[in-house]
Regions:
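Surface-exposed, charge/polar-rich loops and edge strands
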Residues: 1-351
């Protein structure tokens, strides 16, 4: 059903965290004005691949619609925008559904011009970071370039709908916006002995911690890595029943995941960018999945990592740089097909 008038759509997701606690994230959908990355208005945090973009471009040409959204993060430490939009979430929801993973999704339509203006005013001039949907965003840019070339100098609509994309906006600092780590499993090679670890990682502190059972791994990692968030820190697990914990002081302006890739994956294991592209590393999101891979002989060592902070993500993107492949993921994922946006007719921008 086509909306009769411009609106934002609020989404509340109630979900279980990895630790079992029930959490809530609120955000909203709107039309995002497309900007080239060089303008530093919409910022990527990772690189993309050509193949997925080619497939998405074919789909966009065929449907002339956004069938899924780009997931964007904005910065609002004081939660000011959420307070402005709270009235919209107090109305009866349009729909409520729970998916197979136990996430409850509730959808609202924000018709009030005051709510729409609050979002536009807050986001005006603020850079946003793509949390998920880099391929979708770059495909939208490519499609817009095609449409612009086809239109030529004929004029027409000032802001045609293909100059916007369907986007979901969430506050990076809200309690329900979870940035979680993606771990590494080194697929092959020889596992360093304790003395070799220390030799290859000068300046790093080291502890050996027994792992009594796999079931206790999440708690053990929280105890050992949690207090060292923001530092280059990791736990190495070769399946022997002992975790090797390493950390060192952070250097000014340093991003922890970059240090680990340079000094551990590159320095200890000798794995460069070419080997990474050829599949030398697997990327489990769950530490228990990484542990199972090692114990099943699908890898020689798992490297368990801390999550990145919003500050680390925004500092990298503000400099026009990107993080190593699969540095972080965001929970919960957005449902696909909840909203569609036609690339015909008027558009009302949010950011």
């Amino acid at each position: 059903m086509q909306d009769p008038a411009p609106a934002l759509y609020g989404l509340r997701q109630r979900f279980p965290s990895p630790g079992g606690k029930t959490m809530v994230r609120e955000g909203f959908f709107g039309a995002l004005r497309l900007e080239e990355y060089a303008r530093r208005v919409v910022c990527p945090h990772e690189r993309t691949l050509a193949g997925p973009k080619a497939d998405r471009l074919k789909l966009l040409r065929a449907t002339r619609a956004n069938l899924s959204s780009v997931f964007l993060l904005y910065q609002d430490r004081a939660n000011k925008l959420a307070a402005e939009l709270a009235g919209g979430f107090e109305q009866p929801a349009l729909a409520i559904a729970t998916d197979a993973s136990g996430i409850e999704h509730s959808l609202w339509r924000f018709e009030a011009p005051t709510l729409q203006k609050a979002a536009q005013d807050f986001l005006k001039g603020q850079a946003v970071v793509i949390a998920d949907g880099h391929h979708r965003y770059e495909t939208a840019l490519a499609y817009a370039a095609e449409c612009r070339a086809a239109a030529g100098s004929a004029g027409g609509v000032r802001d045609p709908p293909w100059t916007f994309a369907l986007a979901y906006f969430a506050n990076a600092y809200a309690p329900g916006t979870l940035l979680l780590p993606i771990h590494r499993v080194i697929r092959s090679g020889r596992v360093p002995k304790a003395a070799e670890w220390r030799t290859r990682l000068p300046g790093w502190h080291h502890e050996e911690v027994p792992l009594a059972s796999m079931e206790g791994l999440p708690i053990l990692l929280a105890e050992q890595l949690g207090p060292r968030r923001g530092l280059p820190a990791f736990a190495a697990d070769d399946g022997s029943g002992t975790l090797q914990i390493f950390w060192r002081p952070a250097r000014p302006g340093e991003i922890s995941i970059r240090a680990i890739h340079a000094e551990v994956i590159g320095g200890v294991f000798g794995i460069g960018e070419d080997a990474v592209r050829q599949g030398a590393i697997d990327y489990p999101k769950d530490a228990l999945d990484a542990a199972r891979e090692v114990r099943a002989g699908q890898g020689v060592v798992a490297l368990y990592l801390n999550p990145l902070s919003p500050e680390e993500v925004f500092s990298v993107t503000a400099a026009g740089e990107v993080l190593p492949q699969k540095s972080t993921f965001f929970l919960p994922k957005l449902p696909t097909g909840l909203l569609f946006r036609l690339l015909e007719g008027p558009s009302e921008p949010v950011g």
